[in-house]
Amino acid sequence: MYLGDIVGRAAREKVVRELPDLKSEYLVDFAIVNGENSAGGFGITEDICKDLFSSGVDCITTGNHLWDQREILDFISNEDRLLRPVNFPSHTPGSGFNIFETEKGKILVINVMGRLFMDPLDDPFRIIDELLINNELGKDIDAIVIDVHAEATSEKVALGHYCDGRASLVVGTHTHIPTADHQILQFGTGYQTDAGMCGDYDSVIGMEKTEPVRRFVEKTPGNRFSPAQGDATICGVIIETNDDGLCDKIEPLRLGGVLSST
């Protein structure tokens, strides 16, 4: 199970509350969430990580907002379940991938950021290629999940096809809107351009809508954005893999809030 960007307290508390039942209902072996917006919409803290882990999260991925809460710099150096984008500079604290030993086998999670309309980072295609060459799906590793935190749809789609047949799931994050293109690619990799956010969709991508709308209309600075506090929708994707580690089944998850549920 993969859940998209958690935005703010209301979404965080709903994920913590609902995740145990979701894991039981869907017989989930491994749960991943993107937590980069979980602290008031900006970054993540040690306490939030611990709450998510306690609720049943196995791995937390992030993105460009990771360092918005500076306390996480020390924590990430000693917590291998919390990932930062793998194409950050090599001396950056933390790791961009981890191999998890589970009862069902080894699961490799890779967190990578795109470069189109984003920060200038190392080439995500090259870095992912190196990791997949050294960790072959179905031989060295039983399942591989890649979180592509990127702005451009084209870059996410291209990365999906580039990894097709070499990963179990390639799923996009960052734009906070779930796409309707969940599919199994030609060579067996599950794919969705964006998992969407876990947050209140009566908002502007998770933020209380008054200030973002005002800024678009008036083109002037104003108050700090704050997460919307209405009923959150839990958004993500669930896959089943076969003995080769490829995707046999993929389905979107939307639960609660103003979006239609799956």
Task: Describe each model-derived feature in a short phrase.
Residues 1-262:
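Acidic, metal/ion-coordinating pockets
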